[in-house]
Regions:
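Rossmann-fold NAD(P)-binding glycine/threonine-rich loop
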Residues: 409-467
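Glycine-rich beta-to-alpha active-site loop
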Residues: 103, 108-153, 157, 327-332
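Intrinsically disordered, low-complexity segments enriched in small/flexible residues
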Residues: 2-18, 35, 49, 69-71, ...
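Conserved Rossmann-fold dehydrogenase catalytic segment
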Residues: 199-200, 222-227, 435, 442-448, ...
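Gly/Pro- and small hydrophobic-enriched strand-loop and loop-to-helix capping segments
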Residues: 136-158, 193-207, 347-353
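Internal alpha-helical scaffold of NAD(P)-dependent oxidoreductase catalytic cores
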Residues: 184, 342-344, 450-482, 490-506, ...
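Glycine- (often His-adjacent) and acidic-residue-rich active-site loop
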Residues: 72-105, 152-155
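Conserved CoA-thioester-binding segment of acyl-CoA-metabolizing enzymes
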Residues: 1-73
Length: 602
């Protein structure tokens, strides 16, 4: 899973589900239990940080409290990083206020006058993990996971998280978690020493009992600097990490070197000085343009799931529906195993017995290859196979909610589908959508993006089911209207390159700039015509579908970084070469007149 992969359902606490005060407290047998009930999956924003600071202060001052336990409502202890950076723009960057507040809170937790235990469940991410590492002890549900996504987003972990991780585990294990592309289980050998495991059903009682035990026996409080005991091994891990880095890092990777400097400071400096050193680097990384670009794309990934159809229907009704699929053997081998692994019941259908047998055999061969390569166990393969069936005709008694067909199967399958069964067209590379709802993956061997091409009056539930299907295929779904945005954006960039190569003269601006301008201008047209919903969708389209560098944020974000007045001026210069490609779109003129940016349309 990449930094921009479709996020799994976080079950965030929103609206009435989030407590007004964000932190609830009850005291039982001398243990104060503080429960985070913050918005958006308990992400550590300024309000939640302030509420926690008040809650801890009150518990520490209460003579009837001997120990403190911190837990959380909802499916996650902390679902992710708080969105604290503004969109890319030419405005001078500001240090987010929450950085200092979280660091101060973690310092107070680390100096708690009473034993403080964190009871962890679900995802323990970013600021939530920094809080946990500052506590005296952690008690985790065996299904809990931990992650600092910041190193993959141009930043450093907040709240002294990298330091405390190294202090507890040593440099090698700390780097395993810091460099992990996805959350690690608390049972992972690298981080298992952090946690006392407890069954989920008994997590809170176990944490309360452990906190009370530590109050009675403070000598049992885990050593906060155990990871520094083997100094040669610590230094060796840092040497290996530095040896694996380029001698000269580009600007968007400077935070990687800073992270190693912080881990080195964890060993060489007194704790207070190391924390101050870390804080400077955390703030510096947050000010970088690449950090803002990564943050923009993270928001774009979540925002892309909000569509007119998602507002009109309940996503829950789009889940867990059996799928009828009429696919070529190659396409079935590509798509069906992942759907089966995700629990989808799939019925493959074909008019020809031989063709159906060939398609089923293609899926079986892919399963065998996955078992042989270690990507799946034999038991899992056999379990998945129970969810697959084949038919030569429709079963009127068991009509699926959704049918998926490749182009060759559209006509005959559509003619036989009963009323109420929606068909989605899987558009192969270069094809055109032929249904009310079509799925068009990005043209790549392993696509990360799938456009949901929606025609006029397409049923909202069908769009949602198609979006859910794309996510189950581990593709980021992007809703577009009537035609592919990616195809037009790629065509604009290619056309700009061709114009420059065949012109026989020096372009008015550097070639790369000319291609960027053409892409931005095409994106503006797609927004004006209603093909794309928002500028961030276009950025996500180019990053996931065309290899646009993530650290640049996407073409529309770059347009905002340039500034629309400068953008219009440069487009007018470029239009002398090709007016159709570079004449500023009217949307750009409208935004300038209103004093807006592309980001204001997100």
């Amino acid at each position: 899973m990449t930094a921009l992969s479709p996020p799994p359902p976080a079950g965030p606490l929103r609206g009435a589900d989030a407590a007004p005060q964000f932190v609830q407290r009850r005291t039982q047998e001398g243990v104060a239990v503080l429960t985070m009930a913050g918005p958006d999956g308990n992400r550590l924003g300024p309000e939640l940080i302030a509420a926690l600071a008040r809650g801890f202060s009150a518990a520490w001052q209460d003579d009837g409290v001997r120990a403190v336990v911190l837990t959380a409502r909802g499916p996650d202890f902390c679902a992710g990083a708080f969105a604290d950076l503004p969109p890319p723009s030419p405005d001078p960057p500001q240090i987010p206020e929450g950085i200092a507040a979280l660091a101060d809170l973690c310092a107070k937790i680390a100096a708690s006058p009473k034993p403080l235990v964190c009871a962890l469940h679900g995802r323990v991410i970013s600021g939530g993990l920094a809080l946990a590492l500052a506590a005296q002890a952690l008690v985790g549900d065996a299904r809990a996971t931990m992650h600092f996504p910041e190193p993959r987003l141009g930043r450093l972990p907040p709240g002294g998280g990298a330091l405390r991780l190294a202090w507890r585990l040593g440099a090698e294990a700390a780097l395993q978690l810091l460099n992990a592309p996805a959350p690690l289980s608390v049972e992972d050998p690298a981080i298992a020493p952090l946690n006392h495991l407890a069954p989920r059903e008994g997590l809170l009682p176990a944490a309360q009992a452990f906190a009370l035990h530590l109050a009675r026996h403070p000598e049992d409080i885990p050593a906060p600097y155990g990871g520094l005991e083997d100094a040669p091994a610590y230094r060796a891990a840092l040497r290996v990490a530095r040896a694996g880095m380029p001698r000269e890092l580009p600007a968007h990777r400077q935070h990687e070197s800073a992270l190693l400097d912080v881990l080195e400071a964890a060993q060489l400096l007194p704790p207070d000085q190391a924390l101050g050193f870390d804080q400077v680097h955390v703030q510096d990384a947050a000010l970088s343009p690449s950090a803002r670009a990564y943050a923009h794309l993270s928001r774009a990934t979540r925002r892309a799931l909000v569509t007119p159809e998602s507002r009109a229907t309940n996503m829950l009704s789009a889940r867990n529906s059996p799928l009828l699929a009429a696919l070529t053997p190659a396409l079935a081998a590509q798509l069906v195993p992942g759907l089966l692994r995700d629990g989808v019941e799939v019925t493959l259908i074909d008019q020809s017995r031989d063709a159906l047998a060939e398609t089923l055999e293609a899926v079986a061969q892919e399963h065998l290859a996955m078992v042989r390569d270690g990507r799946m166990t034999q038991a899992a393969s056999e379990q998945d196979w129970q969810r697959l069936s084949g038919r030569l005709s429709l079963d009127p008694a068991h009509s699926p909610a959704l049918a998926l067909a490749s182009t060759a199967h559209l006509a005959w399958l559509g003619a036989g589908l009963p009323e109420g069964v929606e068909m989605v067209h899987w558009v192969e590379d270069g094809g055109e959508p032929q249904q009310a709802v079509s799925l068009r993956p990005a043209p790549a061997r392993r696509p990360r993006l799938c456009e949901i091409i929606v025609q006029e009056a397409a049923p909202a539930l069908s769009v949602q089911r198609a979006s859910r299907l794309a996510m189950r295929l581990k593709l980021t779904p992007l809703r577009v209207f009537e035609r592919s945005a990616l195809a037009q954006l790629r065509a604009a960039a290619a056309r700009a390159e061709q114009e420059i190569q065949t012109a026989g003269a020096t372009p008015p601006l550097p070639s790369e700039r000319m291609a960027l301008l053409a892409t931005i201008n095409t994106g503006a047209r797609l927004l004006r015509e209603g093909v794309s919903l928002r500028p961030s969708d276009i950025d996500l389209t180019m990053v996931l579908g065309a290899g646009w560098p993530q650290w640049r944020g996407g073409p529309m974000a770059e347009g905002d970084m340039i500034g629309l007045l400068v953008l219009r001026h440069e487009l007018r210069r470029a239009a002398a070469w090709n007016a159709a490609l570079w004449t500023p779109d009217t949307l750009i003129e409208e935004l300038i007149q209103r004093g807006d940016r592309f980001s204001d349309l997100n």
